[in-house]
Amino acid sequence: MRHAMVGTIAALAILAATAGSLAATPSSPLAAILADPGRPEADRARDADRKPAELIAFAKLRRGASVAELAPGGGYFTRLLSAFVGPKGHIYAVAARPSPALTEIAGSHPNVSIVAGKPGEIPVPAPVDMVWTTLNYHDFKNSKQGDTDAAALFNQAAFKALKPGGIYLIVDHQAAPGAGASVTSTLHRIESVVVKREVESAGFRLDGESDLLRHAADDHSLGVVETGIRGKTDQFILRFRKPR
């Protein structure tokens, strides 16, 4: 019995090591998804920095859920979210100009659809369980429709798109204390206090925040793509909930 237990523990340890850092979320679906040899090597190389298993767990994403992913870029999270929610769930990739990689993902994953609208729109066909965006909110501040920036429009659209009790997850690069939203177009950072204030003003309540992607060595003075800091920026994670 003892030998069987030791063998089981060893197997689980190997699986966890293969899948990346899963200490916070030892669930087998996430481990299997991350360990999938079919994932692009470039995606697998980013797992250690992005900690997707822990992030998905913090987001409280459920199997079978519907998700609107804002500005998904090359689809790193799109692939993972699609695999995690499974065939009973759906990912709506909100992208006005989808990348070739995102177009390929939508073509090969039946539960992924690309939906396009004006900046600040989330044109989903039915209310969703979650709105998800990573490293984009600061860029939304740099685009306007009339006198209103796209961040405010997306916050309003997220509130409208979500089911009562739905989650709005935002991850972004932290700016220096006092910077507010003044460096969104230069350093591509924003202070989390600004995001909290703006999202709560759209009707959401803060449901949780995580230090999972904090990096104390980042002094917030460099642009996020500069050599030595790219992939190692100090990032905040905010989980908001639409009241029921």
In which residue ranges do the predicted regions lie?
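Bacterial N-terminal signal peptides
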Residues: 7-17
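Conserved Class I S-adenosyl-L-methionine
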Residues: 180-207
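A short glycine-rich, Lys/Arg-flanked "PGG" loop and its adjoining helix->strand segment in the class I
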Residues: 82-83, 148-164
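Core SAM-dependent methyltransferase catalytic element
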Residues: 219-244
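A short acidic, Gly/Pro-enriched loop at the edge of an enzyme's catalytic core
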Residues: 109, 122-135
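Short glycine-dipeptide loop
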Residues: 64, 87-88, 162-168
